[in-house]
Amino acid sequence: MALVACQPQPVGTGSGKAHQADTGGSAAGDFGPPQGDPIQAVLTSAPDVPPPVDRDYPAKVIVDMEVRELDLEISEGVTYTFWTFGGGVPGSFMRIRQGDTVEFHLKNHPDSKMPHNIDLHAVTGPGGGATSSFTAPGHEAVFSFKALNQGLYVYHCATAPVGMHVANGMYGLILVEPPEGLPPVDKEFYVMQGEFYTVGKYREKGYQPFDMQKAIEENATYVLFNGSEGALVGEKAIKASVGDTVRLFVGNGGPNLVSSFHVIGEIFDKVFQEGGTRYQENVQTTLVPAGGSAMTEFRVDVPGTFIIVDHSIFRAFNKGALGMLKVDGDDNLSVYSGKEVDNVYLGDKVMAEDLSIVSAVTLAESTGTATKEQRIDAGRVLYNGTCSVCHQQNGEGLEGVFPPLANSDYLMADSRRAIEIALNGLAGPVTVNGSPFNSVMPPMSQLNDDEIANILTFTLNSWGNEGDTVSSAEVAAVRAATERPKGAAE
């Protein structure tokens, strides 16, 4: 709902009445001295949000924030050293009232290797607090500020090199509620985008250090919601029920990229762009700048899984910027009739909840213990997310368009050729099981050697095919010996 003192037109009324000329704004803040006893701020980790401010006076609010440098999973089987506010990425969500006086305690854990500080965009003062909060490992800095402006604000570390601190996850959101508070909604969630720059490729297993050159070139390895691939999918998806009004507090830590924030299958009834106090109505996609925010509100009218993406779409399906809103309740066939989104649409390779199957095989292969059955299981997961749109889940393809893999004489005749096709694509006429095909398969060289090996092991041993395993070493050898078409990924 709106950051407003007046009552806006109800969401989705469709009444045809003229819109109010003023779509937002609020009563002036109460900037008098704090009243009552000091209040300890409630801090939450994404996607949770602290409860609304339930008072009608300015208070002294004490915020205790600890910086931790932690090795955490950025994707299944991939670890990264995150620098965090509050132990997670994004940092803890803070919720205060316009006119509050905030006493901010920034503590840098003794195990940290770096000094840190904090720049809160909600602060009026030099550096947004950064000049007063420089904190060495094992130390604590304290400063105070008055929340003069309402809105949804980013905070981040501003210690040199600033870009590196932000790229390692040092950002979060602080909400300054208007004096009258926010109108009630049914569900509120905290979603923050950021990109990460690793030495290894996307989903390359093991520990991955920060890559400064990639960051300078703005060539992100990962673009993620809430700090890790899969943070908002499967059992971790945010949840609502039909009829709920959902409010998303959306931030973008950057450090470089602007987010094209979109929920597939929903239209935002209201968007408070850049975290301000005026709203736009009936918005499909909203831009959230690096170091900026937006507050979106919408009513969910039908059940299903609604996919949250950065609509700069390769980031969603090839770099991880994908989440889920799962809505339960009764169908409303007058609004929407049809099947729920097919899983193969949800990711270029595989949904994050299935990554553990793939990761386990990768680990087993590195120790020489991977079995053929494990490779087939991992290959099935990867095939369903990558190949089944064209070749179909049953491997039968589409007659006259996409050749079959099931009982395929062409596939089974030459496993090395199959590797070359997976890496480099195929164009031109071929004959499969006696039928001609003349379509185009794009190179899939963005997949790593393990993934291609497991997909081929699955296809060579499914749907009546009886073949051998393909190893990642075989794929690596073909990758090294052949040249990719222009424009193919490496």
Language-model features and meaning:
Residues C6-V381, E399:
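Copper-binding active sites and cupredoxin-like electron-transfer domains
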Residues F134, L287, M324, N394, ...:
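Conserved beta-strand positions that form and line the central face of beta-propeller blades
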Residues S359-Q374, R380, V432-E490:
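Flexible coil segments in periplasmic/lumen-exposed cytochrome c-class electron-transfer proteins
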Residues K107-D111, V162, L175-P179, N384, ...:
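Sec-exported extracytoplasmic/periplasmic mature domains
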Residues A158-P161, F196, C390-L398, L423, ...:
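Detector for the c-type heme attachment site
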Residues G291, D310, L405, A422, ...:
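Hydrophobic, well-ordered secondary-structure elements that form the walls
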Residues K372-L398, N407, L411-N424:
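Sequence/structural segment immediately N-terminal to covalent heme-attachment motifs in c-type
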